[in-house]
């Protein structure tokens, strides 16, 4: 092989150098680099798992948010409905109270008017009696005795209407 230009000493030295360089590179370069790459691959896989887990938790949180929102809307609708019922009830109650108050005021006014009407009737009776006695005294030309006045009063009162609702006096 010498004829081909191969020197065995140099070839073996080159092979030994190559093996040493390969061993040194493997020991100090390839293994640490492969170890770093493996760690990076694990971190990436772990990050992907965490991202998937976070994505799932986010979806669950979104579902929980939607459920809470739905429940809040239901509760708000219920509260609004209850408020409307209460407002309606309160409105009806206020209307009822106003109607009762109006009835009370109307009844009081009717009673007051009735009392005034009775007072006016009584006053008119007294005036009529006094006028009848005075006119009779003038027609007769003398002062009437107490008995005559009493008899005349009874006669006039018997001809005046006693019942409520009669507006005109009888002429009998």
Swiss-Prot record:
**UniProt KW Transmembrane helix keyword:** yes
Tell me which species this is from.
Methylacidiphilum infernorum (isolate V4) (Methylokorus infernorum (strain V4))
HAMAP family cross-referenced by the UniProt entry: ATP_synth_b_bprime
- State how it assembles: F-type ATPases have 2 components, F(1) - the catalytic core - and F(0) - the membrane proton channel. F(1) has five subunits: alpha(3), beta(3), gamma(1), delta(1), epsilon(1). F(0) has three main subunits: a(1), b(2) and c(10-14). The alpha and beta chains form an alternating ring which encloses part of the gamma chain. F(1) is attached to F(0) by a central stalk formed by the gamma and epsilon chains, while a peripheral stalk is formed by the delta and b chains.
Membrane topology classification: Single-pass membrane protein
Q: What is this protein called?
A: ATP synthase subunit b
Q: Name one Pfam family in it.
A: ATP-synt_B
Family annotation (CDD domains): ATP-synt_Fo_b (cd06503)
Q: Which residues cross the membrane?
A: 11-30
Which GO molecular function entries does the Swiss-Prot or TrEMBL record give?
proton-transporting ATP synthase activity, rotational mechanism; proton-transporting ATPase activity, rotational mechanism
Q: Does the keyword Metal-binding apply?
A: no
Indicate where this protein resides in the cell. Answer: Cell inner membrane
Q: Name one GO cellular component term.
A: plasma membrane
Which UniProt keywords are listed? ATP synthesis, Cell inner membrane, Cell membrane, CF(0), Hydrogen ion transport, Ion transport, Membrane, Transmembrane, Transmembrane helix, Transport
- Write down the InterPro entries for this protein, in alphabetical order: ATP_synth_B-like_membr_sf (IPR028987), ATP_synth_b/b'su_bac/chlpt (IPR002146), ATP_synth_F0_bsu_bac (IPR005864), ATP_synthase_B_chain (IPR050059)
* Function (record text): F(1)F(0) ATP synthase produces ATP from ADP in the presence of a proton or sodium gradient. F-type ATPases consist of two structural domains, F(1) containing the extramembraneous catalytic core and F(0) containing the membrane proton channel, linked together by a central stalk and a peripheral stalk. During catalysis, ATP synthesis in the catalytic domain of F(1) is coupled via a rotary mechanism of the central stalk subunits to proton translocation.
Q: Which family does it belong to?
A: Belongs to the ATPase B chain family.
Q: What is its main location?
A: membrane
